[in-house]
């Protein structure tokens, strides 16, 4: 049974439009080096692997949250599904005492979580598993949302100097459309005592969103406008992110999130890709 969080989710994705909202940027200290992108080995190819996003709304004071943690762990051990999704944990249930909490996580849950914890939502929408946290329910939704080929491919490079993270992103369209790019910083291995934990691994929290960059749209969730791209077109954008002192950069990675405008003008997740800090991720071709 899900635990009702006594807050109101005031900004559901169903109500999200393309209205711009000014956001004060994070300012890194010191010089920010923007790394070079990896070479595209197949410039004429636009058949890209597709990954959906699983967004876990959770927190260390949530005694029911280990139920979803158990299902996500089991999902990660299914070879048929590991390449079909990226998992993000938004620690938003409690700000006090949760070392994985961040304002970025709170923004995500404000936008997409119904207010019940734990909850798993999909592709930056309010679509969720309902009352079931079973692995079979999650895989059924993955099967429904996953595509054989993505509408856009992602290549990226990330580097760190001090607390300054520099990220370089290139996207290549397989389908004509209007695209946006955002980058999120995820941290692994955060130790925090989990209410309701029955095993020690539940006290280690990974894929926790710690920071976001991507300008002004809806709390930075949807990202920077890249404009209209035709099939085969590429677009590039660089980002800088200031990492908080509480974030252990050596345990972090970058999730590149690309959203595409639908016929109603609202943005939906088109693809996402993980990039190691100090490394690169090349286009993932089928």
What are these regions (language model features)?
Residues 24-33, 59-65, 200-201:
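Short N-terminal helix-initiation segments at or just after the protein's N-terminus
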Residues 86-286:
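Short, conserved sequence motifs used for protein processing/export or organelle targeting and
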Residues 14-15, 19-22, 44, 77, ...:
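Domain-level signature for proteins that mediate thiol-based redox and metal-cofactor handling
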Residues 10, 46, 54, 79, ...:
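A generic structural signal for short, solvent-exposed coil/turn residues
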Residues 2-50, 282-286:
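Bacterial Sec-dependent N-terminal signal peptides
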Residues 38-79, 83-85, 90:
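Local sequence-structure signature of Cys/Sec-based thiol-disulfide redox active-site neighborhoods
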């Amino acid at each position: 049974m899900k635990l009702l969080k006594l807050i109101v989710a005031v900004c559901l994705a169903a109500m999200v439009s393309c209205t711009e909202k000014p956001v004060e940027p994070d300012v890194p200290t010191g010089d920010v080096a923007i790394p070079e992108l990896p070479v595209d080995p197949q410039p004429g190819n636009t058949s890209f692997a597709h990954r959906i996003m699983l967004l876990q709304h959770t927190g260390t004071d949530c005694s029911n949250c280990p139920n979803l943690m158990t299902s996500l762990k089991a999902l990660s051990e299914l070879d048929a599904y590991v390449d079909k999704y990226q998992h993000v944990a938004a620690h938003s249930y409690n700000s006090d005492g949760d070392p994985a909490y961040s304002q970025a996580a709170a923004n995500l849950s404000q936008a997409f979580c119904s207010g019940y914890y734990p909850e798993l939502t999909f592709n930056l929408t309010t679509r969720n598993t309902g009352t079931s946290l079973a692995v079979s329910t999650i895989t059924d939704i993955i099967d429904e949302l996953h595509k054989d080929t993505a509408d856009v491919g992602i290549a990226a490079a990330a580097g760190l100097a001090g607390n300054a993270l520099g990220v370089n992103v290139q996207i290549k369209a397989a389908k004509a459309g209007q695209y946006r790019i955002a980058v999120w910083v995820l941290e692994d291995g955060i130790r925090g005592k989990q209410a309701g934990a029955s095993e020690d691994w539940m006290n280690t929290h990974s894929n926790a969103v710690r920071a976001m960059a991507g300008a002004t749209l809806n709390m930075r969730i949807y990202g920077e406008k890249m404009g209209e791209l035709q099939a085969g077109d590429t677009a590039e954008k660089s980002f800088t992110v200031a990492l908080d002192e509480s974030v252990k950069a050596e345990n972090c990675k970058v999730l590149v999130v690309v959203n595409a405008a639908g016929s109603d003008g609202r943005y939906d997740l088109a693809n996402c890709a993980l990039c190691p800090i100090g490394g690169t991720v090349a286009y993932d071709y089928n």
